[in-house]
Amino acid sequence: MQELGITGQGSVRVTRKEGNVVVLEKDLATEQMVLAMGPQHPSTHGVLKLECFTDGEVVTHAEPYLGYLHRCFEKHCEVVDYPGIVPYTDRMDYLAGMNSEWAYCLAVEKLLDLELPRRVEFIRVIVSELNRIASHLVAIGTYAIDLGAFTPFLFCFRDREHILSLLEWASGARMLYNYIWIGGLAYDVPADFNKRVKEFVDYFRPKAVELYQLLTENEIFVKRTKGIGIMPADVAINYGWSGPMLRGSGVQWDLRRNDPYSVYPELDFKVPIPDGKFSDVGDCLSRHLVRALEMDESLSIIEQCIDKMPGSEGFNPRAAVPKRVRAKAGEVYCRAENPRGELGFYIQSDGKSTKPLRCKARSSCFVNLSAMKDLSKGQLIPDLVAIIGSIDIVLGEVDR
C-alpha cells in the first residue's frame, strides 16, 4: 500500500510498507507557491492580507501586509486638544473602547499628577471589565465560526448583548463610548446600575461554564487547535507579546497584577495560564483557554468593585476634570492591560500648548501579529485560519 508524505523540503515522499519496514519509492519534486489570503472584509478579523509561501500544502512562512485601515491616529493627536483625543482612542480597538480610553486617560492623568475620587476608580474598573468580557466573547465566538462551529458564535453574541445594554445605559453608546474622561467620567452610573450588573454576573457565570464546555469538549475544535501554532515562552517574550497571547505561552504576566494601577491592588483575582494537561502550552488551544478562563476572573473583579464602591451622595464625576488641559513640559509613558494585551501611550508635552507635542500608541495587536512568520512556519494552509483567529487581532488598533 502506497502512502504520501509531505516533507516540507520541496518534495512529496511516496512510500510503501513491507511488513514493518517502510520502503522509499520516490520523491516527487514540488514548486514553491505564493498564495494571497485577503485582504479580508472588515467584518471578519479586519482588512489584513497574508502572503503565504507554500511548499505543497505546507506553509514555509506567511508575511502579513498591513496599512489598509491606517487613519493617521498619531498625527491627528498633534492637532487635537487632550480631551478631544479620547474619542479617537475608541476607534483603535473598537471592541474594547472603554479599555482604550482608560489607557490614554491614565497617561494624561500621570502627566498632570491628578488624584481621582475612589468612586470614579471603581466605576472605571467595572465598565472596563465588562468591556473585557464582551471583547473575549467576540474573540471566542468568531474563533468558533472560523473553525466551522456556528452555535457558540450565537451564544457569545447573545450574552454580549446584555453587556452592551449595560454599557449603553451608563454611557449612552453601545460602542465608541467617550465615557472615561481625563480626571473622571462623563456621567455617574444610573441609580440601579450596580444592581443590574450584579444580576448580569449571576446570569453569566453559569453561561461562561457552559460556553467553556461547549468548545473544549468538542473533539473537532480540540483537534483543530491543539498543538497548532505553538509559541515558546522565551520567543514570545522576545517578540514583546502580552495579554492572553503571552499567558497562553505559560508566562503569568498581567499588568493588573504585576504593575497594578487604579484600585486593582485592592482586588483579589487569579491570572490564568495553561498547565499543559489539556493543551500544549503555547498553542492555539492554550490561548483560547486563557480568554475563556479570564471571563470568570473579570466577574469576580466586578463583584468586588460593587461591594467596595463608595456611595453616590455628593459625588461629582467631573470634579477632577480640568476645564482646560495644559500639561507641564515633559514626557510620560503609561500602559494598561487591555483584552488583547498591553496598550501603552507615550505622550510628550512642550508645556505651552493644549495639544500634545507627540502621542505614540504601543499596540499589542501589532506586536502579536508581528510573530505570524514564526507561528505559520511548517503549518498546513487550513491551520493558518486557526492561528490567525487565536491571535484575536483588531486591525483598527494594528493600523491606527
UniProtKB/Swiss-Prot annotation:
Catalyses: a quinone + NADH + 5 H(+)(in) = a quinol + NAD(+) + 4 H(+)(out)
* Pfam families given in the database record: Complex1_49kDa (PF00346)
Does the keyword Nucleotide-binding belong to this entry? no
Q: Does the keyword Disulfide bond apply?
A: no
Record keywords, A-Z: Cell inner membrane, Cell membrane, Membrane, NAD, Quinone, Translocase, Transport
Q: Where are the transmembrane segments?
A: none
Q: Give the enzyme's EC designation.
A: 7.1.1.-
A GO CC annotation recorded here is: plasma membrane
Which domain of life does the protein's organism represent?
A: Bacteria
**Gene Ontology MF term list:** NAD binding; NADH:ubiquinone reductase (non-electrogenic) activity; quinone binding
Topology in the lipid bilayer is annotated as: Peripheral membrane protein
Location(s), subcellular: Cell inner membrane
Q: Which InterPro entries match?
A: NADH_Q_OxRdtase_suD, NDH1_su_D/H, NiFe-Hase_large
As for what it does, the entry says: NDH-1 shuttles electrons from NADH, via FMN and iron-sulfur (Fe-S) centers, to quinones in the respiratory chain. The immediate electron acceptor for the enzyme in this species is believed to be a menaquinone. Couples the redox reaction to proton translocation (for every two electrons transferred, four hydrogen ions are translocated across the cytoplasmic membrane), and thus conserves the redox energy in a proton gradient.
UniProt cross-references to PANTHER family, sorted A to Z: NADH DEHYDROGENASE [UBIQUINONE] IRON-SULFUR PROTEIN 2, MITOCHONDRIAL, NADH-UBIQUINONE OXIDOREDUCTASE 49 KDA SUBUNIT
Q: What quaternary structure, including any partners, is listed in this protein's UniProt entry?
A: NDH-1 is composed of 14 different subunits. Subunits NuoB, C, D, E, F, and G constitute the peripheral sector of the complex.
Q: What does the sequence similarity comment in the record state about its family?
A: Belongs to the complex I 49 kDa subunit family.
Please state what the protein is called: NADH-quinone oxidoreductase subunit D
